[in-house]
């Protein structure tokens, strides 16, 4: 009887404390005609909660997204949507490239503490051991390339939208690795977590800055499992050690879209060195004059290097407050010392030695989260900057406070998001001096294209959502009579592009 009661009690506890699961959007298909695109999908929820379903349309412009109001959307959209087979029809907007987001969520919330606690110090340590080594464009080019590859591979494997921003630094082409986890309803509002991945030529760079890279990688793994209203962007910056070259190029040479609103940057700059010994923390000259309260508090604690420094300017108060709140809420054992520099930090050059400064110069809110570099870690920029000198508990807590801030500020959704890219193009029937016939329409098992005076051409056929179905080049002899087998193509509306030296003919062809 005792064992039976314990079993019943255990089941009750599991049921009582089990997390409500978010709804899921599954089995999505789309059908398109000349006027609308219809999305068919299955809405599932383990608890059969009714959901709110939204559809957002954005016009793609370069690397940015512009919200678009589309009237006449019909179907299973709005509040109190039950589970089951659903459909939403969207009137086609004007010519252009678009992002369509379908969002479904219930009335529940995630346990954010549980997400924060997913940060794994053993994982951080493993990443640090691998990252440790000379990551420098001349003194350690092979190791630098290996780290670049692992960052790119991680971002791709997590199904983010990765990109590489490049710029020249002398004869060297620097590479900033970027991964975007786009927001469901406000993708142009962006939170950034960054770290530079290079190091000085004469050190293994464990604290500076493998800790930052490992922390960013850990957050990117965890964040990938969730959806947000706003976008979260991860950036691995190159050539920081030569004067913030990578981040300056990113901010000033096309890395940021003019349509983007950067709501906060969490820049990791050495986050792993900790000491609870008296006099392990020194301060820059004049620190006590600019920051008297913080200086007095550090002195009262016997100058122990047992805190993370949260460096902000006045424009960065919002993201700074979010980090402090997260530390207090989710990691109360992490001691945070916040410094607000005047203006953009011209009076405090020691607080401008990392990539946050590039964002400050551009008027973007950014923090430098740091253990204090050479004012605490005497292994800074030496061959002794190794993993085994670092404190995983401290580093893990910094990462936890950071991910907590991102969860809150990016507005996590207890739900699912389906994204689809849509291309809308108006047909062009003819070109001067060229005769082209594309038939039959609707097509059957063979699509015929005949032409006169076309010369060399390329035939490109894609769905209206942009998926490439067929692409082939033809010389002038073959272009007059082309036959394309279409028996295996699904029913849809297709865009046929017949491209010649004189121009491009576009025709919409339907398969029923």
Which residues make up each language-model segment?
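Bacterial Sec-dependent N-terminal signal peptides
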Residues: 1-22, 426-428
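Extracellular acidic, Ser/Thr/Pro-rich low-complexity tracts
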Residues: 42-49, 59, 453
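A glycine-anchored, Pro-Gly-centered beta-turn/N-cap motif
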Residues: 82-84, 88, 96, 455, ...
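N-terminal capping segment at the start of a domain
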Residues: 108-143, 198, 376-385
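A non-catalytic alpha/beta surface segment that caps or lines the substrate-entry region
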Residues: 126-182, 336
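Acidic/histidine-rich catalytic neighborhood of metal-dependent amide-processing enzymes
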Residues: 200-315
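Active-site-adjacent substrate-binding region
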Residues: 271, 277-422
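C-terminal outer-membrane/trafficking sorting elements
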Residues: 429-512
